[in-house]
Amino acid sequence: LWDEDLRSEILLVDSAREVIGVGLNSLGYSLNDTDTDHLQEAYAKLCELTPNVKAIVGDEIKMLLANEEAAVGVVWSGDAAIIMDENDKLDYSIPSEGSMVWFDNIVIPATARNIEGAHLFINFMLDPENSAQNTEYVGYATPNAAALEYLPEEITGDERFYPGPDVTDNLEVLANLGKRMLGYYNELFLEFKMHRKRA
């Protein structure tokens, strides 16, 4: 990302944990680091990236990348699958330094009024055939092992989305760092965005 050939060619997703995480991972630190010295190092490293950042954007990142309005984007894997469906010249890779692993959760709130309906919906979504269909639609890999047999090999064999342990061993789940530390991440991200405007 810091390659001078990428000047004004990178799109970043508008999310503090993801962007600060890029800085942390590039330095060999955990995405869940709470050491303020490490976080300041990550901020400084991101400031060095400023000349290469074209924009920090939200959901429009998919359209911008598909239209080749930037050479590189830091995106979630499901968005990458959608982007690559729209433009087969684009590719997706997971940084060797590491990245995050995430998953959606289906929960039933304590205040839910239709518990039976909620269970029916969850069971419907977890049905292997339905789960496979959902995976093909959203582009995100499925953790539902029973659904894998309903997916084509071109999906399950794609190591960009179903990587082996050599890649997954460098992935981390984002931990809840608490309000104070989350506030610190958000402050650093805001400082980074302001630094870009001044640069």
Predicted feature locations:
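Conserved C-terminal helix/tail region of periplasmic/extracytoplasmic solute-binding proteins
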Residues: 63, 165-199
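Periplasmic-binding protein-like
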Residues: 39-48, 86-112, 156
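Extracytoplasmic ligand-binding site segments that recognize negatively charged/polar headgroups
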Residues: 1-69
